[in-house]
Amino acid sequence: MALKREIQGVVLQKAGDKTATILVERRVMHPRYHKFVKRFKKYLVHDEKNETRAGDTVVAVECRPLSARKNFRLKAVLAKGVE
């Protein structure tokens, strides 16, 4: 069985029932200037129990496609956001 990819990010918004949008930051080296720059990407995550709120830090794990853009399932909520 292949290892499932895990991503960690911050919940931006609840995109609907059982769906959250998370922002994932990664650091890559610039090819010319050899400086680390931040790159951001948004993912849709399946939240079966509707337990996330905007600002939460979460971990999601890759799964089978649940919709056209949703390929991750919520694994854990690491920290609650300040509201």
Curated annotation (Swiss-Prot):
- Give the superkingdom in one word: Bacteria
Kindly state one GO CC term assigned in the UniProt record. cytosolic small ribosomal subunit
Does Cell inner membrane appear among the keywords?
no
SUPFAM superfamilies, per the entry: Nucleic acid-binding proteins (SSF50249)
Biological process (GO) annotations held by this record are: translation
Keywords annotated in UniProt: Ribonucleoprotein, Ribosomal protein, RNA-binding, rRNA-binding
Kindly indicate whether the keyword Disulfide bond belongs to this entry.
no
An example of a Pfam family matching this protein is Ribosomal_S17
Q: Which GO terms describe its molecular function?
A: rRNA binding; structural constituent of ribosome
Q: What does this protein do?
A: One of the primary rRNA binding proteins, it binds specifically to the 5'-end of 16S ribosomal RNA.
NCBIfam families per the UniProt record, alphabetical: PRK05610.1 (NF004123), uS17_bact (TIGR03635)
* Assigned protein family: Belongs to the universal ribosomal protein uS17 family.
How does it associate, per the subunit comment? Part of the 30S ribosomal subunit.
What is this protein's record name?
Small ribosomal subunit protein uS17
**Species the sequence originates in:** Campylobacter concisus (strain 13826)
The gene from which this protein is expressed is rpsQ
